[in-house]
Amino acid sequence: MCSFPCMDFLNDLGENRYMKRIKLTVAYDGTDYGGWQVQPNGVTIEEILNREISGLTGEEIRVIGASRTDSGVHALGNVAVFDTKCSIPAERFAYALNRRMPEDIVIVRSEQVADDWHPRYQDVITKTYEYHIYNASVPNPMKRRTSTFVSFPLDIDQMRKGASYLIGEHDFVSFCNVRTNTSDTVRTVYDIMIDQNGEDICIRITGNGFLYNMVRIIAGTLIRVGRGFYTPERVKEILEAGERTEAGVTAPPQGLVLVEIRYGNENE
């Protein structure tokens, strides 16, 4: 039985229940979580969603997520789905769940999708990430959860030149964690923009998909370009080398945000 608190829009729904698949767009501050995926140690985003949706619907719910972000990584537009017989209208799940969620997790929107719609195996057109850097002589405590602090001046023009070599279809094996669980390391990067607003630097990257830690390794490499440790042309050499050890360090998680996942034919 759906346990959603009595509201006017439910008064005339009756008991005609059928299974439906609900898609959620989820935003969160990942600082205090052990990542997306349920694990034995530490509270995760997936765990909170399972708990609160189950409490709302009175069913045992297990969400399926699009991107299993790491501990400390944030999102503005991660995606999850779940199946339910609860009679709450699909578009009202966001409101109902936000009444239950902790302040650092927000359901941006909810909608019904086809019963076989899957957030990972669907037609993903693009994914967009941002990596945020606070570039100043001393840290800003107000930005410590959402930006990576770099005290040495960064040359943005050099970083942009280095980033240009990453645009297009390439084998990004040099830019992924050695634990990447895939044999296909070819991805297409459509665009990389690096913007600076005072002491804030944002690396925004859009592609058809990303390997494990790929964006953070790209950010770590471009930071080395910005500091003058690498020339921009070194990025091309790293790409061609096909060796993880050639690239820069994996940048810390707090600067990374999953901004958006765009799908084709979502409701077909």
Where do the protein language model's features map onto the residues?
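Structured-RNA-binding interfaces characteristic of tRNA pseudouridine synthases
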Residues: 8-268
